[in-house]
């Protein structure tokens, strides 16, 4: 038997398809999401419906976003789900989640077994819509979840960490082995819950500045911030902001990055 075929569908490598088949894991994820009738539930990448079916059983209506035309067609003809689903056959990276929430009249509850090849850019896309999102539950590569939940002074701590924790409270839910999927991926997976802050503990006036600083610092993460951010801050300015200039990018907390972003917004670096 071809281990890339499940329920008659051939897993497409270009879409990063690995289908969840472990019932215990499926039940655990649905329990973590705890969907309730009347909520605006949106699934990204429903695939063959492993999560769609048990979540849909609890809902009157739900929305799914599926890029694969064949899988979208299967869902449109699903005997139990077809009358409940609003299907968007498109790339989730092109979805305006704010419009979707406005149409629903409430913030969205987003979940999915995300294709690992697009998980990081998709997270950044979703972060730009956190005002329209109540919470998110995602199956991701375990290494990505480790980065999302990391603290300073660790190798996993990076730009994704800072931006995720700026926007959301990030909570690991469970780890998932490769054997829970068909075909089995070559990496371990994990489920994470992201809850956008109702009141941001580290408000930033211009998020683009935070993005710029973190990109620059972590692109040169082995350098001290005195060097990696030298065109933006003098060593004296870093010291005044409570940051030792000999620290590296991974040693600086989310709160400190936010402080740097707000200071730079108020004191733009001179053009070189």
From Swiss-Prot:
Belongs to the class I-like SAM-binding methyltransferase superfamily. rRNA adenine N(6)-methyltransferase family. RsmA subfamily. InterPro entries: KsgA/Erm, rRNA_Ade_diMease-like_C, rRNA_Ade_Mease_Trfase_CS, rRNA_Ade_methylase_Trfase_N, rRNA_adenine_dimethylase, SAM-dependent_MTases_sf. SMART domains: rADc (SM00650). HAMAP family: 16SrRNA_methyltr_A (MF_00607). Specifically dimethylates two adjacent adenosines (A1518 and A1519) in the loop of a conserved hairpin near the 3'-end of 16S rRNA in the 30S particle. May play a critical role in biogenesis of 30S subunits. This is Ribosomal RNA small subunit methyltransferase A. Disulfide bonds: none annotated. It is found in: Cytoplasm. PANTHER family: DIMETHYLADENOSINE TRANSFERASE, DIMETHYLADENOSINE TRANSFERASE-RELATED. CDD domains: AdoMet_MTases (cd02440). It comes from Serratia proteamaculans (strain 568). Its EC number is 2.1.1.182. One of its GO terms (cellular component) is cytosol. It holds the Pfam family RrnaAD. One of its GO terms (molecular function) is 16S rRNA (adenine(1518)-N(6)/adenine(1519)-N(6))-dimethyltransferase activity. The gene is rsmA. Keywords: Cytoplasm, Methyltransferase, RNA-binding, rRNA processing, S-adenosyl-L-methionine, Transferase. It catalyses: adenosine(1518)/adenosine(1519) in 16S rRNA + 4 S-adenosyl-L-methionine = N(6)-dimethyladenosine(1518)/N(6)-dimethyladenosine(1519) in 16S rRNA + 4 S-adenosyl-L-homocysteine + 4 H(+). S-adenosyl-L-methionine binds at residues 18, 20, 45, 66, 91, 113.
């Amino acid at each position: 038997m071809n281990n890339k075929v499940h329920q008659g569908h051939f897993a497409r490598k270009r879409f990063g398809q690995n289908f969840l088949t472990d019932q215990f894991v499926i039940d655990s994820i649905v329990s973590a999401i705890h969907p309730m009738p009347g909520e605006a539930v949106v699934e990204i990448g429903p695939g063959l419906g492993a999560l769609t079916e048990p979540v849909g059983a609890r809902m009157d209506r739900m929305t799914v976003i599926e890029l694969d035309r064949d899988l979208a067609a299967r869902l449109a003809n699903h005997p139990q789900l077809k009358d409940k689903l609003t299907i968007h056959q498109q790339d989730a990276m092109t979805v305006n989640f704010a419009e979707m929430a406005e149409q629903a009249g409430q913030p969205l509850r987003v979940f999915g077994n995300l294709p690992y090849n697009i998980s990081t850019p998709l997270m950044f896309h979703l972060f730009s819509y956190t005002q329209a999102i109540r919470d998110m539950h995602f199956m991701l590569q375990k290494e990505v979840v480790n980065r999302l939940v990391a603290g300073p002074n660790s190798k996993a701590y990076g730009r994704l960490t800072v931006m995720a924790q700026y926007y959301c409270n990030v909570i690991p839910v469970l780890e998932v082995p490769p054997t829970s999927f068909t075909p089995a991926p070559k990496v371990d997976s994990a489920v994470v819950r992201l809850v956008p802050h109702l009141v941001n503990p580290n408000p930033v006036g211009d998020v683009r500045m935070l993005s710029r600083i973190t990109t620059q610092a972590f692109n040169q993460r082995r350098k001290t911030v005195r060097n990696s951010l030298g065109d933006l801050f003098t060593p004296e300015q870093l010291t005044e902001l409570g940051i030792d200039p000999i620290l590296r990018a991974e040693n600086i907390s989310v709160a400190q990055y936010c402080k740097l972003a707000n200071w730079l917004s108020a004191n733009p670096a001179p053009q070189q």
